[in-house]
Design a protein with these regions (language model features):
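Polybasic, glycine- and aromatic-enriched phosphate-binding surface used to engage nucleic acids
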Residues: 1-87, 91, 154, 162-170
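Non-catalytic DNA-recognition/assembly elements of restriction-modification systems
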Residues: 68, 72-170
Length: 170
């Protein structure tokens, strides 16, 4: 969704059949599979989103141009690590399906999120963290610092290695 509650730990993301028309309040990722679903459903991506997204009142306002296009995806990912993310993403879908009377909004209510769905997200985070080689903390600040370092490397900014300018003390 373009706008999501600030109370949610994860933005509810899912698949829809080809006959579904997306409104201007949804984003679509054509050709996305389980790997993309997993990456976008992870704490890593959600930490990035909470830092880079705009706001509509206090809710997060997701942007393709700012959040998605600038998200520093992991580099070369082995087939085994990719499969681990895909499998964990499918487990999230399975956990959601176990609650057929609940909407995505219901499932991602932080006060009512089912334990099996929360556990599936924990397993996904472990798999996604492994794709990055991330061994830092589980808090957003540590994740975002890691992602910004990756972003700088991908963008070729080399800010950490830039020569500092000498001050003119004259």
């Amino acid at each position: 969704p373009k706008v999501s509650s600030e109370r949610r730990q994860f933005i509810p993301i899912g698949y829809f059949d080809p006959t579904t028309l997306a409104s201007d309040l949804l984003f679509i990722v054509p050709g996305a599979g389980s790997y993309e679903l997993g990456m976008l459903s992870s704490s890593m991506h959600n930490a990035w989103m909470r830092t880079t997204a705009g706001r509509l009142e206090s809710r997060y306002r997701y942007s393709v141009h700012v959040v998605y296009n600038n998200f520093p995806w992991p580099g070369d990912v082995s087939a085994a690590k990719r499969e681990a993310v895909e499998s964990a993403a499918r487990a999230i879908l399975t956990a959601r399906a176990a609650h057929p009377d609940s909407t995505l909004s219901d499932l991602y209510d932080p006060d009512a999120m089912p334990d099996d769905l929360r556990d599936a997200h924990r397993a996904l985070d472990k798999a996604v963290d492994a794709t990055y080689g991330y061994r830092g903390g589980k808090d957003d600040a540590t994740r975002v610092a890691f992602l910004f370092e990756r972003y700088q490397a991908l963008a070729g900014l080399g800010l950490a290695s830039a020569n500092p300018r000498k001050r003119n003390r004259g």
